[in-house]
């Protein structure tokens, strides 16, 4: 009886060790890719991973000349059908346009005319800054002060008073910066700064 219980105990221990051995062997198995060896199990593997950085840099430099030029982004101007879009240099950026910027925090102009992503330009004079430079400066430096923020309120001059010009044309002496969270101004308040 002792021998049968001893044999049974040995079989149970052998079975338990074989189950535990399988789970540890599954953990120690090398993954299919050699890229994961140093990160997943550095103690079980003595292999050194050597990244072929010279080959990557060389491939990047040799392929660089064959890559197309980048024509993407927010505010992309247009695609002209008369020329290949790959021959133009980088034409991307936030709000990149030939006319004044009409976006952002505190934008002064009320008319927002977004450009589409892909269209041909019929009137190139409209996008030229040379012929309407005065209009551009008037729009850019108009009499409207900086007024931005959440809950901003406009300001009015008291009855009978006129806006006094500052150093430059269209500079208004008055509350130029009206910003803040929920900042409200009553109509009867005189705004003197």
From Swiss-Prot:
Tissues and organs where the protein is expressed, per its UniProt entry: Allatostatins A1, A2 and A3 are expressed in brain, antennal lobes, optical lobes, gnathal ganglia, the retrocerebral complex and thoracic, abdominal and ventral ganglia. Allatostain A4 is expressed in brain (at protein level).
GO cellular component: extracellular region
Subcellular location: Secreted
Keyword Oxidoreductase: no
Entry keyword set: Amidation, Cleavage on pair of basic residues, Neuropeptide, Secreted, Signal
Modified residues (Serine amide): 165
Residues bearing the modification Isoleucine amide: 74, 94, 105, 150
Family that this chain belongs to: Belongs to the allatostatin family.
Function according to Swiss-Prot or TrEMBL: May act as a neurotransmitter or neuromodulator.
Protein name as catalogued: Allatostatin A
Source organism of this protein record: Camponotus floridanus
